[in-house]
Amino acid sequence: MRRVICAFVVVVLLLGAVTEAKASLYNTHIADTDTISVSLLTASQGKQIYEKFGHTGIRIHIPSKKFNGVYHYGLFSFDEPHFEYRFVKGETDYMIGLMHYHDFLTMYAIRGSSVRELPLYLTQEEARLLFAALQENMLPENQTYRYSFLYDNCATRPLDIINRSLKGEVRRDTTDTDLPTFRTLIHESTGQDKWVTFGLDLMLDGETDEQISLPDKPFLPHITEYIFQTTEIDRNGTVERLSGTPKEVLKAREDVEIKTLFSYVTPMVFAISLLILVVLISIKEIITVSHSKITDTIIFSVCGIFGIVIHFLLLFSEHPAVSSNINAMWLHPVWLIVIPFIWIRNTQKFLYCYHFINFALLLLFFVVVIFVKQQVGAVVIVLVMALLIRTITYLTVERRRKHIR
């Protein structure tokens, strides 16, 4: 009984301490004698698509005030009205949030991610300026900002606000020209999920094939961490490193990946299988002088649906890197318009004209790919070849029909 009572007392005291600590996050006044330590937290990627790129937080620790908070940008809610539509449109507003340090670690422990902590050697004046700026950001009128996937996200905002707090000449190595492109970094982040990688490749244009800009726009959390690790600052003639040695404060959970049949059906496997199937069906059509309406209906439907998404992004979205996508040449809504004519009699002339124009457009696509900076990938080439074969097959069958008549 005595052990139970002791355990109960300990739990109550711990809960009280945690509650007091959390309350202090929102009610902290700094005195001149208070010491502030600052560090950068970098979380590794998670399993959900919005977790694939990791996360960044700024830890502010004021022991005398029992303040141990993490400010982090990039908060959003799926419950916001029309969130999905606004996200595709590029009109989503993200927020800055504040969590207790231990809650931050718990959140990522549940997710299975690792967290690294990089101590930043800010002076007390700089730390106070940073803390004041973060607190000002937390005001309701300043809490939200317009999200940009490449240029204004959870990795860029911490870099910007810390930079504004520094007093001295910041020195960063800008001689490295062998920098990765945005697309390369995206592939590194989503590499385990081939379908996510393929989907993003379809939607993003040549802007993502430009090199990232250091130290201005890091794009990803681990790049922000790297920037601070390689930064020096000249304070009154004394050059010092801005950061210490990073340490892992939370280890990633090693989950056993369960392989399913779908795991082996990668976009490339699917594309090659489709190409082989299309070749076999097309050969049969040419021999029998007929058209497989079901085959074309399925293929045209998929291309048309994806085409609606691609053209919506191209014409209406405010997101960067979607407004000059050459995939719009072969993924477009016109495929859907053509489908009814496949099943209507006496529409051969219309379909012949469409396929003739489409044949020229698909050939032009292969030419454009050579000269533009956008990397479309081997999967797209295989899929476009399948479409080209369907178009050539239709034109060939119709020509044979004319000769038979």
Language-model features: where?
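Generic detector of multi-pass transmembrane helix bundles and their immediately adjacent loops
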Residues: 279-286, 293, 301-405
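Core alpha-helical transmembrane segments of integral membrane proteins
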Residues: 231-320
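Positively charged n-region of N-terminal signal peptides that target proteins for export
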Residues: 1-7
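Glycine-rich catalytic cores of cysteine/serine-nucleophile enzymes that process amide/ester linkages
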Residues: 34-113
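Boundary at the C-terminal end of the N-terminal hydrophobic targeting segment
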Residues: 21-25
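Active-site nucleophile-His-acid catalytic modules used for acyl/amide transfer and hydrolysis
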Residues: 104-180, 382, 386
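Soluble non-transmembrane domains of integral membrane proteins
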Residues: 150-222
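Bacterial N-terminal signal peptides
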Residues: 7-16
